[in-house]
């Protein structure tokens, strides 16, 4: 029945992917796409679906107070700031458009899983909460997934996110801290005020020190200055300069080591009477307290599901995803993909159209693993 449903709804899925992809949805501005998803769900019979205060679209299936809950998520937002509709182009069996792989194709497959449940109404051993969530990308800071945890904490047994390629599973959380650092000085005319402190130079000193920090070795840890700006003109001593800085790790203790190193460097320059402003732009948690046997069981279940419908070798690794929120609270969580594509976060992003079929079978098999009596 599963495979028959997917094959029969192949064209509907493709059209849904195209429609979702066409709707712009920068982080924090998912309103239009959320409204479309809610309307689509209502048309399928999901009368209880609703949009919450942070723009998540939620639909609970079989959720009662006496049952544990498993959360399924696929995110609404994309990295692109556009507010005009995107155009989906097709060539050589591929669909091209910004955001089509991350995460519109996976979102479409999750919605089709809901359609299956509403069509056949199977009895479940757990409640399933489906969430088309907001703010997964960048400085969205996992606002959508954090809201779901806060609303249902104590009831969530597992979490599965549809996000990425179908031959990849993420089961470890890469945490991060992101900052904007702004340095201000008196500046002045490059000739007449020569000798005054230059904000660009002072900021560059801070950057050089940050790049000399000795990395912890307990887990992979990285850092990056990804953007700098400042100054006025070639003949002006810069009075303001700023940078965006982040560090990442799979381990919370490594993150703390990097945080302390950052704070110490800033303090060093504050003692030189520099005017420095530090803003925390984002914080994503690492995993903490997850039962390894339960996580391995959830991971292995999905490895077997993927291998049932594809001949691809499954890669298991870490990432910064909606699963971070749940892994940080000890909830076994995995991220699986339901499509093959590439060019993620570029305007040449693409998916292989035919992989939506095995991808949807993978997603649906995951969902149906919670049906009473199913294996």
Q: Which positions does each model-derived feature cover?
A:
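Metal-dependent amide/peptide-bond hydrolase catalytic core
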Residues: 1, 164, 171, 180-375
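Short, conserved micro-motifs enriched in small and acidic residues
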Residues: 28, 95-108, 123, 194-200, ...
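Buried hydrophobic packing segments
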Residues: 37, 107-117, 148, 203-207, ...
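Short coil/turn connectors at secondary-structure junctions
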Residues: 65-70, 84, 91-92, 124-128, ...
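Short beta-strand segments
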Residues: 73-74, 131-133, 159-163, 182-184, ...
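Acidic/histidine-rich catalytic neighborhood of metal-dependent amide-processing enzymes
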Residues: 99, 104, 108-174, 246, ...
């Amino acid at each position: 029945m599963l495979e028959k449903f997917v094959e029969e709804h192949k064209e509907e899925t493709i059209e849904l992917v195209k429609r979702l992809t066409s709707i712009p949805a920068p982080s924090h501005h998912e309103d239009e796409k959320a409204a479309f998803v809610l309307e689509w769900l209502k048309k399928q019979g999901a009368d209880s679906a609703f949009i919450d205060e942070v723009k998540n679209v939620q639909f609970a299936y079989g959720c009662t107070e006496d049952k544990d809950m498993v959360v399924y998520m696929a995110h609404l937002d994309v990295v692109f700031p556009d507010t005009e509709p995107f155009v989906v182009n097709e060539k050589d069996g591929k669909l091209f458009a910004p955001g089509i792989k991350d995460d519109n194709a996976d979102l479409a497959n999750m919605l089709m899983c809901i359609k299956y449940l509403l069509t056949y109404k199977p009895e479940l051993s757990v409640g399933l909460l489906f969430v088309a969530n907001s703010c997964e990308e960048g400085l969205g800071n996992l606002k959508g997934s954090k809201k779901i945890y806060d609303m249902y904490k104590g009831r969530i047994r597992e979490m599965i996110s549809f996000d990425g390629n179908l031959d990849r599973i993420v089961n470890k959380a890469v945490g991060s801290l992101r900052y904007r650092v702004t340095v201000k000085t008196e500046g002045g005319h490059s000739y007449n005020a020569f000798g005054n402190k230059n904000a660009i130079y002072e900021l560059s000193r801070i950057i050089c020190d940050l790049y000399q920090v000795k990395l912890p070795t307990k887990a992979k840890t990285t850092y990056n200055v990804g953007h700098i700006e400042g100054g006025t003109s070639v003949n002006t001593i810069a009075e303001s300069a700023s940078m965006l800085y982040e560090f990442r790790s799979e381990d919370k203790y490594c993150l703390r080591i990097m945080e302390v190193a950052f704070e110490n460097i800033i303090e060093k320059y504050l003692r030189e009477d520099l005017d420095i402003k530090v803003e925390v732009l984002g914080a994503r948690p690492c995993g903490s307290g997850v039962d390894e046997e339960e996580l391995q069981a959830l991971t292995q279940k999905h490895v077997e599901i993927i291998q049932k419908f594809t001949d691809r070798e499954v890669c298991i690794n870490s990432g910064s995803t909606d699963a971070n929120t749940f892994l940080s609270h000890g909830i076994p969580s995995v991220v699986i993909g339901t499509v093959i594509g590439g060019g993620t976060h570029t305007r040449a992003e693409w998916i292989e159209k035919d992989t939506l079929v095995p991808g949807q079978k993978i997603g649906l098999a995951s969902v149906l693993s919670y049906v009473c009596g199913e294996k």
